């Protein structure tokens, strides 16, 4: 019997363009595959041993004859390629209507309402890379005290502010105001606080980022598990993505290594249910910034710690390594990419070497976890428990 599942999200680690990638401008994207090509290979011996290289052809990540885990990949049903859409589908909510995006910036009524409520003008109001817009408007922001507001191809309203110009408490208050405005007809999936420090030409975003999400529109695996009396521990930005819904305990992290440390800390504790971890650095530090070398190094750094994670699993534990979308750092632009996600499963009770194939929905993961923990499911997805457990 399995009584604890670790759902371990390697944020943006896609494994090849989906068949509908043309509708998203993402034909040819392949986060893992293209990083390994551009960087002449990638060393992920521990994920390789579990079966990662048996899913797809990745330079330096070879298939193994006897994988220690079960493996496969999944397509996405939802209409999107963003954090919220991906994570919601992973826990059983399929998003058929895409969230609003603002390729021309936010409309005048939104701008006026926001500026009136915060008592300041805003800078920017356009789609932009977060680091590029700091180079462009950071100095003016420091001179005027006006927050920098921008969006992307995702459904986001992002507010950047220097921590010495607009204090964190005030920045978070601005985000709460924006969250109330960006509902209904103007609903965005997330309002994001993007604090930074430093001087013009050398700005650095800090780990004090905060996400303000919409409430999920239906019950997720997390809600069902919580109602069934299970522990649901959110590590990283998980609490923010679900606006706290379905979470019994949450811890925010400063980087990938902290995320792994916290996951291990909770594995050592007495809890039963779900440990839901997100490692965001792949996406935020390397994917959007189109830095394949940094992305590769971050993946290798994570892989080196996998034996440590696995050593803390007990006989009733199961871990699923997966992702929420792609963000190919070799691809055009600076946005997410519409890709398959890898699925690698390990546990003392998991059948080694099983290929679960190509799943039709990320929600198959939710259905499987519901099945394993013997709780109700969301009605979406198809469980693959029978293939992976003795």
Swiss-Prot record:
It catalyses: 2-deoxy-alpha-D-ribose 1-phosphate = 2-deoxy-D-ribose 5-phosphate; alpha-D-ribose 1-phosphate = D-ribose 5-phosphate. GO terms for molecular function: magnesium ion binding; manganese ion binding; phosphopentomutase activity. Pfam families: Metalloenzyme (PF01676). Its cofactor is Mn(2+). Binds 2 manganese ions. Belongs to the phosphopentomutase family. This is Phosphopentomutase. It comes from Alkaliphilus metalliredigens (strain QYMF). The lineage of its organism: Bacteria, Bacillati, Bacillota, Clostridia, Peptostreptococcales.
């Amino acid at each position: 019997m399995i009584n604890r599942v670790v759902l371990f999200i390697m944020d943006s680690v896609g494994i090849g363009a989906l068949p509908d990638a043309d509708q998203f401008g993402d034909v040819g994207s392949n986060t893992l595959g293209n990083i390994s090509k551009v960087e002449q290979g990638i060393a992920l011996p521990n994920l390789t041993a579990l079966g990662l290289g048996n899913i797809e052809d990745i330079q330096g990540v070879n298939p193994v004859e006897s994988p220690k885990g079960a493996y496969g990949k999944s397509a996405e049903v939802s209409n999107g390629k963003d954090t919220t859409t991906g994570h919601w589908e992973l826990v059983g909510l399929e998003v058929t209507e895409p969230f609003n995006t603002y390729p021309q910036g936010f409309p005048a009524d939104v701008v006026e309402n926001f500026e009136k409520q915060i008592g300041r003008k805003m800078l920017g109001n356009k789609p932009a890379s977060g680091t590029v817009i700091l180079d462009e408007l950071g100095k003016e922001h420091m001179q005027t005290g006006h927050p920098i507001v921008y969006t992307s191809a995702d459904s986001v309203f992002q507010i950047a502010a220097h921590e010495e110009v607009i204090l964190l408490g005030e920045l978070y208050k601005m985000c709460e105001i924006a969250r109330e405005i960006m509902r209904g007809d103007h609903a965005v999936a997330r309002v994001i606080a993007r604090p930074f420090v430093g001087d013009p030409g050398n700005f650095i975003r800090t780990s004090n980022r905060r996400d303000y999400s919409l409430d999920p529109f239906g019950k997720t695996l997390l809600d069902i598990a919580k109602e069934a009396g299970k522990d649901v521990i959110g590590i990283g930005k998980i609490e923010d993505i679900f606006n706290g819904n379905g979470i019994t305990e949450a811890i925010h992290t400063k980087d990938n290594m902290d995320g792994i440390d916290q996951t291990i800390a909770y594995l050592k504790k007495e809890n039963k249910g779900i440990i839901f971890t997100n490692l965001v650095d792949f996406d935020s530090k390397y994917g959007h910034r189109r830095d394949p070398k940094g992305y590769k190094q971050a993946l290798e750094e994570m892989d080196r710690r996998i034996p440590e994670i696995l050593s803390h699993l007990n006989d009733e534990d199961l871990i699923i390594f997966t992702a929420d979308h792609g963000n190919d750092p070799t691809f055009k632009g600076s946005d997410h990419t519409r890709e398959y996600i890898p699925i690698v499963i390990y546990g003392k009770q998991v059948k080694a070497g099983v290929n679960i194939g190509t799943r039709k929905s990320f929600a198959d993961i939710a259905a499987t976890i519901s099945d394993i923990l013997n709780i109700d499911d969301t009605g979406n997805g198809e469980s693959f428990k029978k293939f992976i457990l003795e």
